[in-house]
């Protein structure tokens, strides 16, 4: 039975796990937990939503689609009928790893059994049809599409159903209500009330019409009388006589006054005219339109969810329910009763009865998981294929038709390719570190097809809502335009079969069933356990006779406290008083009484119920920190609870449920922030987001101050290797782990070595078990780049001091010690991929070769005989990685060239150098080279003969300009790397590693970082790691006790000495160990310099951005600065020769090279463009000098421009020069 908070404060628990040091010796990694509350249930598998959803699609989702489309008849319906029956997924041709290597899609062939019936002869033809390769989900919840891992993000959208909304009428201030009926597929119905009490409806967003027209039409459609005798005024008034009772506002009467029709026939015709203006209206046409629009299952589908919401909102909330039969969940189309109920409820709301719906409530928003999103897209492909099949059926002879001849799979394959390659919800996986990967799979997006757009989304939909509690994290969301539209599932949240988010709660028993009630039930529906001890009394499914009913009642009652007197109803004798503890003898007496239920002092059990948001609103729910005694009974008479959107202090007798854990409200990323409860929410948001940007470091180091979530997050991320079964390790090396499982089978776990992630970080797995070790199923046996001993390790534990230092940490700048550089503490590995293809061109095939024209031997020194760089070569910017030549266009040959051609044949043919070179600003070591040729694989794109892929690895040390952050949203940029001897040092001579500015703390209100620093210092002295879970972590007194235990001052401040002078600083300084991250915003990726380079073809101004090797924009405000200083010549230079004076910049460059004086600037190209634009408007523009002489503006011809040393300063592209 899990331990729950009691009146006795427990000492901090020690949780241990075995790991080994660098020499292979077994060590104990202990985390002292300051948690006082133990989670009632274990955390679920964090990526189960993705995996379960895709399995549902494979098992049921596809079956539903084929049932939906079956059967497909030809246009006449008399000749052919085609239907899909069983289907199966074959084995994938390549495994995930091979697909990543070959840039292919990890997919399995989908085969379907198709049955074609020739109706004229009765002949049935069956065959198995290949429906294309269907992308498969990996065990980690991802898809490999064209070699790249992608994630399909779950979408949070408005659920199908009916929604009632309140709006104030501006002139009178009266509340008027409207309703929207949203199906899963089909026409929307929008009902409105105007200030004159007229109810109107819009069908499929067309023109408004009185709602009585629709009511009359529906009465006629389902009536058994002729149309002109149905839907009369008295019929309509009688329908709503029970609800339209307000004499001041007669809604139906007012609407009938505005209704031009008088019976069902006229109403159907009127409806047709409004929906199909211009089409000739006949009764049959009008009737069939209404039927197909709202009552045909192929055109109108509420879906299971739509029907469920409709039943909840209309039937269960109806005050005039009177035992009417609720429509079944399988009834996916509208009924006439549904429409009448909507109008009834609308009139009730207008009369002040009932409440409108809250559209932002999670009971009204559902999650479309990956399986449903794929199903929706697959449906699109199937419907396109159905159209093709019908067309082919009409063209072919029925007897000659075959399933293969009718089916064209291209629409289905294209729909799937379009979804996985181009959908807003199919995203390139964030693989920066394991946490980024895990969080991406748990993300919820309100954007995408059928969702919101970020421009139109208002404040309400983005805001935190009370129904998010335990379902969507209130902290983790992006900053910027997507704030509130993209969220993350909370730690314990799951998606139910309807798509609604659920969260678990512990059941609170306020009364227990007595023997007569158990006997009446006849069978146990679930295991019956003792409420406090969890001891099993009866198993689920047991038949209950009189004897077992008594045993169960005694077993459950034993040990409970009575909440009211027990009186024998037959004699009136008092059996027991309120407050008595029930022993076995008293329990036996009570079980013999004819009482059905016994009220007891509320007991919190470990039975958990997962509740969706609308169900939760009915109950009173206590917080996880409510005080309980050793028998799990509430100690206080009232406890702090939630009830719908209110926080109440409720008597314990009214509590229904209790939270399972303090961290159930937040997401995984937020649950990794220690002392979260001491941080401002804005900073916690930044902390959650920045942890996902942490770059994996060379030597991962798990945090000294953790939250206890590190192990679970690492294990479920998909980047570590987890044992599948209990086993013994036979061998363990850097490449694989071989184990023998308990049943004797041997299994090999291959390890990933220095692989490139989607974000160019390094994925490298290291074994954490050794020969002879016994491992258990689910245990982490190999660490990844950002894990240590199976725990998440995103950063490093660093000794920090909070003090200003000569302006070196002004405005969030960070001063770091050279030790971090020298000892590779914040060094990360980055791997970049460079690829070149040899294609067939019109002038002949390209060739990968070492024989490159106009290239010296020095540039070829690292190339092998094929012209491909060696593995292990160190390369610099502009070095050749792969030599490639491309045929040039034939030109008129001179006599000498013709002679050479005659002597040497094709060898003298002109080729140009198109080699793959290292880009500017990149250097590193080649760690892998792969060559793919058409001979080996047929999967290459058309026209490609050979592909060469080179992997380049860089080791990046921490340097000024790199962004660093803590877990509390405290971010900054490294300003300076200071020699170790200059850093401030402790009295024992230990220099600090980082100096942070104390002014960064008070205004940001993220005090968690200070508490982490204090406790980290104490824990590092005591030699253990700490778990301080969110909302249940170390208190102030715990930190003071830990500081005292480790012999540190109680204020955690100490005298520091200046490393440069050895003098003591004036005041004691806060010092301690803090977990710091290096983020994926590295200065090496951002720093950029240019002298000359490419120019825009139209304006001739330098291009912008590092990717284009562009210049730095000298904008309006910078011009003001030069103007303010009166620097006229610098300003002229900026606007002319440094920008778009084409001839001037070439001449200036030449003058600098030759050491000549620089000539005067010419006319900028942008000025010429302006003149041309004015001339295009029909204006004659002349340019005059100061003395009114005309200036000749000529176009700069390519031939007039000088190009020095092969540098093209003209802005003309290479092919044009």
Swiss-Prot record:
Q: Which GO terms describe its molecular function?
A: DNA binding; DNA-directed RNA polymerase activity; ribonucleoside binding
Under the heading Pfam families, the entry gives: RNA_pol_Rpb2_1 (PF04563), RNA_pol_Rpb2_2 (PF04561), RNA_pol_Rpb2_3 (PF04565), RNA_pol_Rpb2_45 (PF10385), RNA_pol_Rpb2_6 (PF00562), RNA_pol_Rpb2_7 (PF04560)
Q: Which reaction does it catalyse?
A: RNA(n) + a ribonucleoside 5'-triphosphate = RNA(n+1) + diphosphate
Coiled-coil parts of chain: none
EC number(s) on record? 2.7.7.6
Q: Which CDD domains match?
A: RNA_pol_B_RPB2
A Gene Ontology biological process annotation? DNA-templated transcription
One GO cellular component term noted in the UniProt record for this chain: DNA-directed RNA polymerase complex
Q: Does the keyword Cytoplasm apply?
A: no
Give the keywords, sorted: DNA-directed RNA polymerase, Nucleotidyltransferase, Transcription, Transferase
The answer to whether UniProt assigns keyword Transcription to this entry is yes
Extract the NCBIfam families matched here. Answer: PRK00405.1
Q: What does this protein do?
A: DNA-dependent RNA polymerase catalyzes the transcription of DNA into RNA using the four ribonucleoside triphosphates as substrates.
Instruction: Write out the similarity annotation.
Output: Belongs to the RNA polymerase beta chain family.
The subunit field of the Swiss-Prot or TrEMBL record says: The RNAP catalytic core consists of 2 alpha, 1 beta, 1 beta' and 1 omega subunit. When a sigma factor is associated with the core the holoenzyme is formed, which can initiate transcription.
Q: What is this protein called?
A: DNA-directed RNA polymerase subunit beta
Q: Which organism's genome codes for this protein? A: Herpetosiphon aurantiacus (strain ATCC 23779 / DSM 785 / 114-95)
GN (gene name):
rpoB
């Amino acid at each position: 039975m899990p331990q729950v908070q009691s009146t006795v404060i427990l000492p901090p628990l020690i949780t241990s796990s075995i790991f080994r040091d660098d020499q292979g010796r077994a060590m104990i990694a202990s985390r002292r937990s300051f948690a006082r509350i133990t989670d009632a249930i274990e955390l679920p598998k964090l990526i189960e939503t993705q995996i379960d959803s895709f399995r549902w699609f494979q098992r049921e989702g596809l079956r539903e689609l084929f049932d939906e489309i079956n059967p497909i008849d030809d246009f006449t319906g008399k000749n052919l009928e085609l239907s899909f029956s069983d289907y199966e997924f074959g084995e994938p041709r390549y495994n995930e790893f091979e697909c990543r290597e070959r840039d292919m899609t990890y997919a399995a062939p989908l085969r379907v059994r198709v049955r074609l019936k020739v109706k004229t002869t009765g002949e049935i033809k069956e065959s198995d049809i290949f429906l294309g390769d269907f992308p498969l989900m990996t065990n980690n919840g991802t898809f490999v599409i064209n070699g790249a891992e992608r994630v399909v993000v779950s979408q949070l959208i408005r659920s199908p159903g009916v929604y009632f909304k309140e709006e104030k009428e501006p002139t009178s201030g009266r509340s008027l209500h409207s309703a929207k009926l949203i199906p899963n597929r089909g026409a929307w119905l929008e009902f409105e009330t105007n200030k004159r009490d007229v109810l109107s409806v819009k069908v499929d967003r067309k023109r408004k019409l009185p709602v009585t027209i629709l009511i009359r039409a529906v009465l006629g459609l389902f009536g058994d009388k002729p149309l002109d005798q149905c839907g009369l005024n008295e019929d309509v008034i009688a329908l709503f006589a029970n609800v339209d009772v307000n004499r001041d506002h007669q809604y139906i009467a007012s609407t009938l006054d505005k209704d031009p029709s008088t019976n069902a026939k006229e109403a159907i015709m009127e409806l047709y005219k409004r929906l199909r203006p211009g089409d000739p209206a006949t009764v049959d046409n009008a009737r069939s339109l209404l039927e197909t629009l709202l009552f045909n299952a192929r055109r109108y589908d509420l879906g299971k969810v739509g029907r469920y919401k409709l039943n909840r909102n209309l039937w269960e909330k109806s005050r005039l329910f009177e035992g009417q039969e609720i429509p079944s969940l399988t009834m996916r189309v509208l009924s006439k009763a549904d429409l009448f109920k909507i109008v009834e409820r609308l009139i009730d709301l207008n009369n002040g009865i009932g409440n409108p719906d809250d559209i932002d409530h999670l009971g009204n928003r559902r999650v479309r998981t990956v399986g449903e999103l794929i199903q929706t897209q697959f449906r699109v492909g199937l419907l396109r294929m159905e159209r093709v099949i019908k067309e082919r059926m009409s063209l072919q002879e029925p007897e000659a038709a075959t399933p293969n001849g009718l089916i064209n799979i291209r629409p289905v394959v294209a729909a799937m390719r379009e979804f996985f390659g181009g959908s807003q919800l199919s995203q390139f996986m964030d693989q920066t570190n394991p946490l980024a990967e895990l969080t991406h799979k748990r993300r919820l997006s309100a954007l995408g097809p059928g969702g919101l757009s970020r421009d139109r989304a208002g404040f309400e939909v983005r805001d935190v809502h009370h129904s998010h509690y335990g379902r969507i994290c209130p902290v983790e969301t992006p900053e910027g335009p997507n704030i509130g539209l993209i969220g993350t599932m909370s730690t314990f949240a799951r998606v139910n079969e309807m798509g609604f988010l659920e969260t678990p709660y512990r059941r609170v028993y306020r009364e227990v069933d007595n023997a007569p009630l158990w006997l009446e039930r006849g069978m146990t529906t679930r295991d019956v356990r003792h409420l406090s001890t969890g001891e099993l009394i009866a198993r689920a499914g047991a038949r209950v006779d009189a004897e077992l009913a008594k045993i169960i009642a005694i077993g459950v009652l034993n040990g409970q406290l009575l909440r009211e007197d027990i009186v024998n109803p037959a004699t009136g004798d008092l059996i027991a008083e309120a407050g008595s503890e029930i022993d076995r003898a008293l329990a036996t007496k009570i079980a013999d009484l004819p009482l059905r239920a016994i009220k007891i002092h509320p007991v919190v059990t470990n039975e958990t119920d997962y509740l969706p948001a609308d169900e939760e609103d009915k109950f009173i729910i206590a917080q996880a920190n409510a005080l309980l005694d050793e028998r799990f009974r509430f100690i206080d008479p009232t406890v702090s609870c939630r009830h719908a959107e209110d926080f109440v202090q409720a008597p314990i007798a009214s509590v229904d449920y209790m939270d399972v854990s303090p961290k159930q409200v937040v997401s995984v990323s937020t649950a990794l922030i220690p002392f979260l409860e001491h941080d401002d929410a804005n900073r916690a948001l930044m902390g959650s987001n920045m942890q996902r940007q942490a770059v994996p470091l060379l030597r991962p180091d798990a945090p000294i101050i953790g939250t206890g979530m590190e192990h679970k997050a690492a294990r479920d991320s998909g980047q570590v290797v987890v044992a599948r079964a209990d086993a013994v390790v036979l061998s363990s090396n850097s490449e694989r782990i071989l184990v023998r499982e308990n049943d004797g089978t041997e299994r090999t776990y291959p390890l990933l070595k220095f692989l490139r992630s989607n974000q160019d970080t390094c994925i490298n797995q290291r074994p954490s078990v050794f020969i002879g070790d016994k491992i258990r199923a689910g245990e982490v046996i190999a660490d990844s780049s950002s894990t240590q001993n199976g725990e998440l390790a995103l950063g490093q534990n660093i000794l920090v001091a909070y003090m200003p230092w000569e302006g070196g940490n002004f405005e969030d700048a960070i001063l770091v010690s050279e030790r971090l550089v020298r000892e590779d503490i914040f060094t990360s590995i980055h791997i970049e991929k460079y690829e070149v293809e040899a294609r067939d061109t019109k002038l002949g095939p390209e060739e990968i070769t070492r024989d490159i024209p106009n290239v010296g031997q020095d540039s070829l020194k690292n190339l092998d005989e094929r012209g491909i760089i060696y593995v292990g070569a160190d390369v610099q910017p502009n070095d050749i990685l792969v030599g490639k030549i491309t045929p040039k266009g034939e030109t008129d040959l001179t006599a000498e060239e013709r002679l050479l051609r005659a002597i040497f044949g094709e060898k003298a043919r002109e080729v140009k150098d198109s080699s793959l070179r290292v880009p500017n600003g990149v250097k590193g070591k080649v760690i892998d080279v792969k060559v793919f040729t058409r001979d080996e694989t047929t999967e290459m794109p058309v026209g490609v003969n050979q592909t060469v892929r080179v992997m380049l690895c860089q080791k990046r040390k921490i340097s000024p300009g790199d962004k660093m952050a803590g877990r509390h949203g405290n971010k900054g940029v490294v300003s300076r790397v200071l020699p170790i001897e200059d850093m401030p040092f402790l009295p024992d001579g230990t220099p600090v590693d980082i100096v942070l500015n104390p002014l960064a703390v008070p205004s940001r209100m993220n005090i968690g970082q200070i508490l982490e620093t204090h406790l980290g210092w104490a824990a590092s002295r005591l030699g253990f790691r700490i778990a301080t879970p969110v909302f249940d972590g170390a208190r102030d007194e715990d930190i003071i006790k830990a500081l005292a235990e480790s012999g540190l001052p109680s204020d955690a401040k100490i005298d520091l000495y200046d490393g440069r002078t050895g003098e003591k600083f004036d005041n004691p300084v806060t010092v301690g160990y803090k977990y710091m991250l290096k983020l994926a915003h590295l200065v090496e990726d951002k720093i950029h310099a240019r002298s000359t380079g490419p120019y825009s073809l139209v304006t001739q101004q330098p291009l912008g951005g590092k990717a284009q090797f562009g210049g730095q924009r000298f904008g309006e405000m910078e011009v003001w600065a030069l103007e303010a200083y009166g620097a006229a010549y610098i300003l002229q230079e900026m606007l002319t020769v440094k920008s778009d004076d084409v001839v001037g910049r070439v001449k200036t460059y030449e003058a600098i090279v030759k050491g000549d004086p620089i000539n005067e600037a010419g006319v900028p190209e942008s000025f010429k463009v302006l003149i041309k634009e004015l001339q295009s408007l029909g204006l004659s523009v002349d340019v005059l000098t100061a003395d009114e002489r005309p200036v000749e503006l000529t176009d700069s011809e390519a031939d007039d421009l000088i190009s020095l040393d092969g540098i093209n300063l003209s802005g003309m592209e290479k092919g044009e020069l």
